């Protein structure tokens, strides 16, 4: 363990200031210098995992290759590192207590009084150590804000960890917010001063401060922060809001963050290889064309609920050198055909999102119908594929009132039904989760888009296409172009004769990377561009528009 270096990223003042993207960007920069890096997120909530949490409270549930339901920050980590992470990369208070209490019940502690210190903190430290095997650098983000009562066991654990592995092997990075007060006309350092002071009260003295602001942080402000934060001026790294997420690594590299980290850890600093990343950013900023995609969902008030989809579309747009304008559509507002036609008319593509529960389902069905009848490119994700099957069954195959048993247990035509091995099982860790192989049918759209015979994709669902209806649906013109290797489970459905109409039972967005856009998203955006060009709708992006990303 002593050969591995550990970096702990904490946050102060307010939440959502960019700890996750800062940690991911630092990991990407260290990897670009040749280091083997892994990232980890500590979430201080008592839920065992976010699998059953409301998306409006938590945002997206990101699924890893090994089937863990995790925090959305793991999506940032994977996209920036371009590597798959596993369940050890997300640790919650609930999972830690679950393990410790299970050991106590088994008698593993030999009758000892089980306490936060040392039992909980030891379990936290063990999870850090296990992740560090075979890696040069472990970067661990501590969720929440310094001062939160929920985070205290994690902060105590990382304080102890420095003594456990040697002080030269641990670095503390604190991300703070420097607000601009309009009335005073200046940036204020007091919140950062109090944040670092609170951290020191817990026994942790930050080695580096990353200071978020909406404008440049001048030398005078940096000196003031350094004075009260007890760090060198060079260790105060300014992080101004960036036009896109993918500008952040280049911005932090320009501020010297990665070089400073290596210096403080006593590691060599080979040159950073950032040519491909710079090319990506140039393509994102240089897009001279724009396409509009109607995105149909029911949690659209919080776009973090679909974060990986947004990023996958951005990756595909970069590959085609177009900006993808997202038109968010509440599925409850388009539940009749006329409303759907009026709302979706002029869209270059229709994307129906995943989700659970009955609310907004009829609107999603009408969106699929509009795309099918108008020839508009369509991409359905998980439930979005099931929706396409239901719509086709009702309106093409003649299966009146066809539905999923998730929404109507009495439907006469359950074209979507629960998997047999899930009947009677409680929610929480019971779905088909993680990576599974998918065999593609030669000559189909799916096979052309992927350019492969077998692919591996990540799943998160309980319901499947009912095999009892596959033959009648295929006879009506639906093509099941991807299945499990044994042919029992439908993975991809598409329509013959349509320019681009495809749905996946899996979640392709989880495997899209900035430099390697997912084939389904790349194909979809390409089809949207073709539709826009044919209709004469390709436009230039609006001047000065940002995607809302920050560092």
Swiss-Prot record:
Residues where Mg(2+) binds: 73, 141
Protein name listed in UniProt: CTP synthase
GO cellular component: cytosol
Residues engaged in binding UTP: 15, 188-193, 224
Function (record text): Catalyzes the ATP-dependent amination of UTP to CTP with either L-glutamine or ammonia as the source of nitrogen. Regulates intracellular CTP levels through interactions with the four ribonucleotide triphosphates.
Residues bound to CTP: 15, 148-150, 188-193, 224
Region of interest: Amidoligase domain: 1-267
Example of a GO MF term: CTP synthase activity
Active site: 382 (nucleophile), 507, 509
Keyword annotations: ATP-binding, Glutamine amidotransferase, Ligase, Magnesium, Metal-binding, Nucleotide-binding, Pyrimidine biosynthesis
EC number per UniProt: 6.3.4.2
Positions with a binding annotation for L-glutamine: 56, 355, 383-386, 406, 462
Pathway assigned in UniProt: Pyrimidine metabolism; CTP biosynthesis via de novo pathway; CTP from UDP: step 2/2
Domain of life: Bacteria
GO biological process assignments: 'de novo' CTP biosynthetic process; pyrimidine nucleobase biosynthetic process
Reaction equations catalysed: UTP + L-glutamine + ATP + H2O = CTP + L-glutamate + ADP + phosphate + 2 H(+); L-glutamine + H2O = L-glutamate + NH4(+); UTP + NH4(+) + ATP = CTP + ADP + phosphate + 2 H(+)
Additional observations: CTPSs have evolved a hybrid strategy for distinguishing between UTP and CTP. The overlapping regions of the product feedback inhibitory and substrate sites recognize a common feature in both compounds, the triphosphate moiety. To differentiate isosteric substrate and product pyrimidine rings, an additional pocket far from the expected kinase/ligase catalytic site, specifically recognizes the cytosine and ribose portions of the product inhibitor.
Activity modulation: Allosterically activated by GTP, when glutamine is the substrate; GTP has no effect on the reaction when ammonia is the substrate. The allosteric effector GTP functions by stabilizing the protein conformation that binds the tetrahedral intermediate(s) formed during glutamine hydrolysis. Inhibited by the product CTP, via allosteric rather than competitive inhibition.
Subunit and partners: Homotetramer.
Residues that, per the record, bind ATP: 16-21, 73
Pfam families according to UniProt: CTP_synth_N, GATase
Cytoplasm is among the record's keywords: no
Family: Belongs to the CTP synthase family.
């Amino acid at each position: 363990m002593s050969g591995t270096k550990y970096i702990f990223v904490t946050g102060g003042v307010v939440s959502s200031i960019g700890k996750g993207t800062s940690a991911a960007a630092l990991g990407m920069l260290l990897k670009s210098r040749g280091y083997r890096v892994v990232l980890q997120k500590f979430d201080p909530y008592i839920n065992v995992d976010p699998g059953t949490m409301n998306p409006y409270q938590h945002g997206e549930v990101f699924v890893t290759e090994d089937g863990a339901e995790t925090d959305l920050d793991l999506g940032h980590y994977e996209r920036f590192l371009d590597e798959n992470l596993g369940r050890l990369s997300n640790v919650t208070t609930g999972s830690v207590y679950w393990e410790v209490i299970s050991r106590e019940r088994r008698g593993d502690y030999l009758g000892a009084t089980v306490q936060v210190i040392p039992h909980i903190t030891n379990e936290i430290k063990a999870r850090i150590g296990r992740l560090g095997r075979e890696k040069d650098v472990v970067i661990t983000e501590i969720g929440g804000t310094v001062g939160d009562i929920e985070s205290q066991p994690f902060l105590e654990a990382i304080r102890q960890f420095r003594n456990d592995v040697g002080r030269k092997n641990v670095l503390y990075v604190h991300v703070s917010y420097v607000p601009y007060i309009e009335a005073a006309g200046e940036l204020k350092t007091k919140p950062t001063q109090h944040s670092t002071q609170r951290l020191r009260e817990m026994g942790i003295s930050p080695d580096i401060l990353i200071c978020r602001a909406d404008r440049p942080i001048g030398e005078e402000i940096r000196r003031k922060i350094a004075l009260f934060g007890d760090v060198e001026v060079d260790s105060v790294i300014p992080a101004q809001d960036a036009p896109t997420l993918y500008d952040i690594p280049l911005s932090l590299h320009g501020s010297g963050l990665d070089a400073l980290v290596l210096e403080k850890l006593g590691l060599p600093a080979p040159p950073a290889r950032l040519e491909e990343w710079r090319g990506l950013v140039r393509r994102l900023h240089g897009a001279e064309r724009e396409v509009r995609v109607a995105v149909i969902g029911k949690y659209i008030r919080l776009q973090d609920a679909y974060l990986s989809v947004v990023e996958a579309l951005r990756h595909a747009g970069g590959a085609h050198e177009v900006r993808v304008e997202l038109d968010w559509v509440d599925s409850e507002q388009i539940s009749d055909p006329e409303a759907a036609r009026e709302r979706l008319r002029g869209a270059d593509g229709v994307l129906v999102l995943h989700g659970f529960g009955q609310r907004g389902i009829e609107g999603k069905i009408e969106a699929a119908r509009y795309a099918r009848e108008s020839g508009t490119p369509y991409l359905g994700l998980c439930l979005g594929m099931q929706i396409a099957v239901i719509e086709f069954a009702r309106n093409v195959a003649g299966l009146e009132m066809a539905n999923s048993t998730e929404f109507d247990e009495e439907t006469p035509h359950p074209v979507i039904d629960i998997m047999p091995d899930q009947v009677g099982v409680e929610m929480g860790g019971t779905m088909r989760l993680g990576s599974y192989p998918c065999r593609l049918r030669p000559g189909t759209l799916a096979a052309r888009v992927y350019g492969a015979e077998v692919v591996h994709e990540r799943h998160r669902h309980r319901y499947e296409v009912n095999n009892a209806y596959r033959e009648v649906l295929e006879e009506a013109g639906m093509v099941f172009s991807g299945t499990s290797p044994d042919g029992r489970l439908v993975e991809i459905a598409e329509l013959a004769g349509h320019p681009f109409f495809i749905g996946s039972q899996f979640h392709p967005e989880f495997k899209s990377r900035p430099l390697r856009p997912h084939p389904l998203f790349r194909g979809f955006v390409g089809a949207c561009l073709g539709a826009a060009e044919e209709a004469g709708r390709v436009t230039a992006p609006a001047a000065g528009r940002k995607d809302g990303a920050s560092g």
